[in-house]
Swiss-Prot record:
Protein name (Swiss-Prot/TrEMBL): Dihydroxy-acid dehydratase
Active site positions: 517 (proton acceptor)
Key words of the record: 2Fe-2S, Amino-acid biosynthesis, Branched-chain amino acid biosynthesis, Iron, Iron-sulfur, Lyase, Magnesium, Metal-binding
Oligomeric form and interacting partners: Homodimer.
Matching Gene3D superfamilies: IlvD/EDD C-terminal domain-like (3.50.30.80)
GO biological process, one term: isoleucine biosynthetic process
GO molecular function: 2 iron, 2 sulfur cluster binding; dihydroxy-acid dehydratase activity; magnesium ion binding
Gene name in the database record: ilvD
Organism expressing this protein natively: Yersinia pseudotuberculosis serotype O:1b (strain IP 31758)
Length: 616
């Protein structure tokens, strides 16, 4: 029988000092011996997805205490990628993921906590906490802050749905008036919550449901809706039961590595492909798998991407549907139900409730369940009132979206495309692979050939795009923006956004060793591995070189002879210490970022630390 970790600090005369300090936090004699459960919050006033989390840890903690545990809350940092976008702040976004994972490990191990409830929401916070959970391998339940309501405004006598990306595109479009741009800006992000499309934050919160580490509804139930409160209460109650299953019943199936095993990781990736999730999810799943010592790689993602159809289309791939519409159609469980009926899921998986896949679908799939309470939960809708408060409204749709032929979620037979929403491409320029969000690519652009326009930084590319130096047919190549080369693997949302603003969104391609925001669409290919700073071929591309992109056949090739590439490599390596670094780029890089760069791996490994450099 495993021993409660917390007994290290609560039992024995030699721990009198530790107990004295525990007493100073409010613990009593009756508490020593109960499981100590960390409530890992991420409240901050910097991020709309986290601005409403201040009091939600208390909800979880009260339920933990009522269920027989001891709750101790602490906070992590949280970076808003949208606010950090387009300037030096974006260098810190991906490295913050490692910092969050480390800080959770530090707090939980330093104080010998027995289990965790992770209150996450936005882009790097959920992945960082997920990495920590699999690293620590103690009982955990995730409950996120929930999605933002979609923005809505009236333009040309028509009500349209909006999100952050619309504000960015229209703000850079010279054909949009200042008045219209301001109107869109004020309407795009109306409430607290993670941005309303299938961007990185919502993608990751959905994947946590598929991994089995979050409760049904977690990925899609709006932050503002009163029903979401129950998820926090249930997380507090169920984490105590989950913890006792492991420590008091020796049930190892309660541990995250046994819930989020390889089969669950495959299901999560299948879900991601089917819903056209953010390409960042590939990076984060690979990183989490490494922390959990799970054999899951780009090879698995490539294999899965070839057989999974695109069943759910959401902004930014369409403006018709946002997360509130996904929820109305049955949320994550609704998509999993269609995937299961298509015979695409691993069925031998479980979740933190102890339910297997069949039981979960019977209870929570709106196409199967007879539970009116579950149907009511999925009918939870937006109120359309600007607010930063959680659980502030209880509006409901008059009916669910169960149209699986033309609705938000579709059957395999009526899929948006028989090819999934993500694809892995290989070729000489990406020997270890690169990622494209096919859900956002125009059908006419699935094959593309064009001359390269090469830039050593995102900033240089943006200046050229807005300056009219990029024309239809070009392949914009942005390099030295990978985990090492950036450092920090910036998101290239501004270049893709400005290509759209300049009318080039469907006539140009963009290729980078950096990454993309979940809000990116168009022929945007990222995560090129190996990156330029690691000697990748992308570092040898020259202006005018032709690049062939073939998404249906999963290929990407720099059309330059092997002899010429060998000569270019020899010339580059002759630069010695200055080889494989950006030419003429001036960028202030702090020591914190330099430390990250020294240990960072390329994107095909999840951009995690190279453990071999640490003796691992």
């Amino acid at each position: 029988m495993p021993k409660y970790r917390s007994h290290t600090t609560t039992h024995g005369r030699n721990m009198a000092g530790a107990r004295a300090l525990w007493r100073a936090t409010g613990m009593t004699d009756d508490d020593f011996g109960k499981p100590i459960i960390a409530v890992v919050n991420s409240f901050t006033q910097f991020v709309p997805g986290h601005v409403h989390l201040r009091d939600l840890g208390k909800l979880v903690a009260e339920q933990i205490v009522a269920s027989g545990g001891v709750a101790k809350e602490f906070n992590t940092i949280a970076v808003d990628d949208g606010i950090a976008m387009g300037h030096g702040g974006m260098l810190y976004s991906l490295p913050s993921r490692e910092l969050i994972a480390d800080s959770v490990e530090y707090m939980v191990n330093a104080h010998c906590a027995d289990a965790m409830v992770c209150i996450s929401n936005c882009d790097k916070i959920t992945p960082g906490m997920l990495m920590a959970s699999l690293r620590l391998n103690i009982p955990v339940i995730f409950v996120s802050g929930g999605p933002m309501e979609a923005g809505k405004t009236k333009l040309s006598d028509k009500i349209i749905k909006l999100d952050l990306i619309d504000a960015m595109i229209q703000g850079a479009n010279p054909n949009v008036s200042d008045e219209e741009s301001a109107q869109i800006e004020r309407s795009a992000c109306p409430t607290c919550g993670s941005c309303s499309g299938m961007f990185t934050a919502n993608s990751m919160n959905c994947l946590n449901e598929a991994l089995g580490l979050a409760l049904p509804g977690n990925g899609s139930l709006l932050a503002t809706h009163a029903d979401r409160k129950q998820l926090f209460l249930d997380a507090g109650k169920h984490i105590v039961a989950l913890t006792k299953r492991y420590y008091e019943q020796d049930d190892v199936s309660a541990l995250p590595r046994n819930i989020a095993n390889k089969a669950a990781f495959e299901n999560a990736m299948i879900l991601d492909i089917a819903m056209g999730g953010s390409t960042n999810t590939v990076l984060h799943l690979l990183a989490a798998a490494q922390e959990g010592e799970i054999d899951f790689s780009m090879t698995d993602i490539d294999r899965l991407s070839r057989k999974v159809p695109h069943l759910c289309k959401v902004a930014p791939s369409t403006q018709k549907y946002h997360m509130e519409d996904v929820h109305r159609a049955g949320g994550v469980i609704g998509i999993l139900g269609e995937l299961d009926r298509a015979g695409l899921l691993n069925r031998d998986v479980s979740n933190v409730l102890g339910l297997n896949l069949t039981q979960t679908l019977e209870a929570y799939d709106v196409m199967l369940t007879q539970d009116e309470g579950v149907k009511q939960m999925y009918a939870a809708g937006p109120a359309g009132i600007r607010t930063t408060k959680a659980f502030s409204q209880d509006c409901r749709y008059p009916s669910l979206d169960t149209d699986r032929e033309e609705g938000c979620i579709r059957t395999r037979e009526h899929a948006y495309s028989q090819d999934g929403g993500l694809a892995v491409l290989y070729g000489n320029i990406a020997a270890d692979g690169c990622i494209v969000k096919t859900a956002g690519v125009d059908k006419d652009s699935l094959t593309f050939r064009g001359p390269a326009k090469v830039f050593e930084s995102q900033d240089e590319a943006v200046e050229a795009i807005l300056g009219g130096k990029v024309v239809a047919g070009d392949v914009v190549v942005i390099r030295y923006e990978g985990p090492k080369g950036g450092p920090g693997m910036q998101e290239m949302l501004y270049p893709t956004t400005y290509l759209k603003s300049m009318g080039l969104g469907k006539s140009c391609a963009l290729l980078t060793d950096g990454r993309f925001s979940g809000g990116t669409s168009g022929l945007s290919i990222g995560h090129v591995s190996p990156e330029a700073a690691s000697g990748g071929l992308i570092g040898l591309v020259q202006d005018g070189d032709f690049i062939n992109i073939d998404i249906p056949n999963r290929g990407i090739v720099l059309d330059v002879s092997e002899a010429e590439l060998a000569a270019r490599r020899e010339t580059e390596e002759a630069h010695g210490d200055a080889a494989w670094s950006p030419k003429g780029r001036e960028r202030q890089v702090s020591y914190a970022l330099r430390a990250y760069a020294m240990l960072a791996t390329s994107a095909d490994k999840g951009a995690v630390r190279d453990k071999s450099k640490l003796g691992g």
